[in-house]
Amino acid sequence: MKRYMICSLLFLTTFVFAQNKMNTRKGKIVFEASIPSFEEIRATNENVSCVLLTKTGEISSVALIKNFRFKLSLMEEHFNTNYMESNDYPKATFKGYIQGFNLNIIGSSTKKFELNGELEIRGKTKPIHTDAFLRKIEDCLEIIAEFKINTDDFDIVIPEIINSKISKNVTVYTEFLVK
């Protein structure tokens, strides 16, 4: 009987704590550094991890650099080898907070929140302040955000020979469906 009580207590404790966290391993990040009239510079990573702590609004995500896909494999190779040095810097991370987050006030209509945190790429960390748009979809929570970063902030060097074809100001779009 004592063993049954202890097992039940452990199960309930785990269940309660699990309710405070929502996550996914199938989040999406799309970035674009295109310049009009030149080749599209756009990549997508659809295997991004994201964790949201529902009690605090704390959010974090991790993207493996080598999981970004371009329309041309040569772009992917240059991105990983020359610009991001993905063997030395294999991931990008974001850690932050959704200000005023309250799961109870989010419904099927999109609700805007302020998202603040730090983005780390290539060992360099920069603050990010943007809007996040949240809504419930069945038993999941959709989190969408968009922001801009500058390649210089993360020591990403674009060779002079092609710097007129790649924008230093990169638009980053994120989409997570956490459960």
Task: Go through each PLM region and give its residues.
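Bacterial Sec-dependent N-terminal signal peptides
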Residues: 1-22
